[in-house]
A protein has these predicted regions:
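A short pre-motif secondary-structure segment
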Residues: 70-71
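Helix-turn-helix DNA-binding module
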Residues: 77-94
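DNA-recognition helix of helix-turn-helix
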Residues: 89-112
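N-terminal interaction/assembly modules
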Residues: 1-62, 110-113
């Protein structure tokens, strides 16, 4: 059975970028939390990043083990499809199915759909 994870292109690109930036944003938030008194930036921007991280973490926590591992390979380790196939043994079908599923679920969690 084919899963239907179709979403508008612009939403897909936005969510995919957020997922690709997840690791860097997580490090940034940890840096700010460790030295919150010295933070002199835009607190609204920090709150928005925290909200986006929460949406992504909620979706990642809801995934089964196989999809979670695939999502980490794709979005956190940032392997290409061929790189994931060679290094991690992730098939092309599993790669794209996991990527589309995670993007769709994060978009729904962010109320973009």
């Amino acid at each position: 059975m084919k899963n239907n994870y179709k979403i508008p292109w612009h939403i897909r690109q936005y969510v995919k970028r957020e997922l690709m930036d997840y690791k860097d944003n997580k490090k940034l938030v940890e840096k700010y939390k460790s030295n919150i008194a010295a933070y002199k930036g835009d607190t609204r921007a920090l709150l928005l990043v925290l909200a986006r991280l929460k949406y992504i973490e909620t979706v990642l926590d809801s995934l089964n083990k196989e999809d979670r591992e695939a999502a980490e390979i794709i979005f956190i380790d940032q392997y290409t499809q061929s790189g994931a196939e060679i290094a991690k043994g992730l098939s092309k079908k599993a790669f794209y199915n996991a990527m589309n599923k995670v993007i769709y679920l994060v978009a729904r969690e962010m109320d973009l759909l």
